[in-house]
């Protein structure tokens, strides 16, 4: 496989589960099976760390039966972290990515640029074809690459509301990613809260 670098604001937040740590069920069970079919680890790790599992909708027909497992959320996170740490060609780095680095494409012929754009190495930013060349961290580190995959979760300019009080933090008191949003907006990507 490709040499891959995973950035995380905290190594302790890898595969951190929410307050209701379920995997599977009626709405998401098919997603777990799709991830499993593609070689993913979600199903494997829940098999190692579940504390209870239940077949839902048993009183209905087999088409709607659905397995849901309740995870030991601490062990699930530790198992997933071990899995990533032992994956060949994968390096984990604890740092906050602040910027996506791009350069103008400057392709001699539009046909080549269109092919590269289709392959994911070019991106149109504010009407101009750009090539992604890397990322820059808050501490100033620059990491060159051929592709960037963003999985921001709930961390971009995260804030927790406790009554009237607003705390600018990620889940469970972890650091929020406060800088990447500006870079994404500068590249013409709209931000929305759901």
What residues fall within each predicted segment?
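Short hydrophobic core segments
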Residues: 135, 142-153
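Conserved N-terminal/central alpha/beta ligand/cofactor-binding core
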Residues: 2-103, 111, 139, 151-171, ...
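Conserved beta-strand-loop-beta-strand element in the redox core of flavoprotein oxidoreductases
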Residues: 101-141
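Generic low-polarity alpha-helical segments
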Residues: 1, 120, 144-148
């Amino acid at each position: 496989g490709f040499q891959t670098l995973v950035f995380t604001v905290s190594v302790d937040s890898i595969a951190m589960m929410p307050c209701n740590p379920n995997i599977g069920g009626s709405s998401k069970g098919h997603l777990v099976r799709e991830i499993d079919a593609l070689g993913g680890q979600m199903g494997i790790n829940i098999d190692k760390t579940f504390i209870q599992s239940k077949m839902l909708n048993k009183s209905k027909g087999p088409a709607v039966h659905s397995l849901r497992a309740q995870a030991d959320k601490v062990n699930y996170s530790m198992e997933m972290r071990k899995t990533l740490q032992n994956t060949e060609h994968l390096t984990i780095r604890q740092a906050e990515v602040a910027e996506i680095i791009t350069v103008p494409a400057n392709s001699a012929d539009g046909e080549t640029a269109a092919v590269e754009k289709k392959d994911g190495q070019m991106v149109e930013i504010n009407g101009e074809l750009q090539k992604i060349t890397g990322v820059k961290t808050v501490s100033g580190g620059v990491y060159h690459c051929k592709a960037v995959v963003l999985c921001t979760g709930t961390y971009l300019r995260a804030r927790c509301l406790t009554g009237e009080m607003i705390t600018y933090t990620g889940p469970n008191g972890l650091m929020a990613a406060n800088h990447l949003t500006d870079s994404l907006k500068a590249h013409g990507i709209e931000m929305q809260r759901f």
